[in-house]
Amino acid sequence: MSKPSVHVAIALLLFRGKVLVGWRNADQHQGNKCEFPGGKIEAGETPVEACRREIFEEVGIGIQQWHAFDVIHHEYDDVEVFLHLFHATVNEQYLADIQKPWTWYSRDQLLGLNFPKANHSIIQRLFWNHHIKISENLSELCRNKQSVVNANALNESNLNEASAQPLFYYRTELLTSAVEQVQQLNLHDLSRLIINVDIWTQLPESLQKAVAAVHYKQQQVMDLQIGQLPLGVRCIAACHDLVSLQRAHSLGFDAVILSPVLPTATHPDAHNLGWEQFKQYAKSSDLPVFALGGLSPTDLSIAQHYGAYGIAGISQF
């Protein structure tokens, strides 16, 4: 006998790097657990219409612009669930209208919350390791496994081993050889790998879903239109100014790399943001911002003081 199926619209509401979370009552399915806002898609509703309605009814705010995030299928013992996920940033003017008991949590705090099993893949996508190693040499991916590990994250039961290790951005212009090399990686290494969209689009679909994130250069970001980001995979934008940072927000990116913060040997002639300008940009972001340029792994606390979520580096990582 087949299980009943339920289609649910789920909203990931973002503000200054935090995510809105609520609590499921004991009498609800999967009760006494945390939840993201949302609810059942009614007959005649599209998923995004249901998302918009549920957020107005449950949270108390009306948001029109939503970005498709993913569709997740999960089977419980008694029911088959399809989660249609969307994400949106919340304007500061709406904060006072948000109804209790909805609460803002940092990405790190999400790891310690008790969510239904169907939400675990959402948590893994929302949480980013705080370090990104950048290299043109893919062989460094394996050597970099234990060089920088978020010690706190390793203690979290909801975080798998790969997520607890630094991410690795394979930066290369050699597309053909890059595609061949990436296809030789195992799933563990793919789960830490960030590659540019030009490489990613040439991979088989199974490998496209396995990578940690898809990278877009600033010009690629500026050339995109709303709705063109791929579904079901994290996307990270390279930004060098406020215009591109704001563009990344409007397009629905998951995170950004903001650079250069300090002078670097690889880009000696580039205009450096400096910490104060970086802080101004990062503090205005609702997405995780990685600081890049002249930083070492030990600079994480400094970068976070100026509004960064994490740091990225080349020669010093």
Task: Label every model-predicted segment.
Residues 195-210, 240-251, 284-290, 295-313:
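Catalytic cores of alpha/beta
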Residues 1-20, 71:
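Conserved N-terminal beta-strand and adjoining loop/helix that marks the start
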Residues 87, 95-127:
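NUDIX/MutT-family hydrolases
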Residues 270-278:
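Charged helix-capping and loop-helix junction motifs
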Residues 72-96:
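Active-site-adjacent beta-strand/loop module that shapes the phosphate/pyrophosphate-binding cleft
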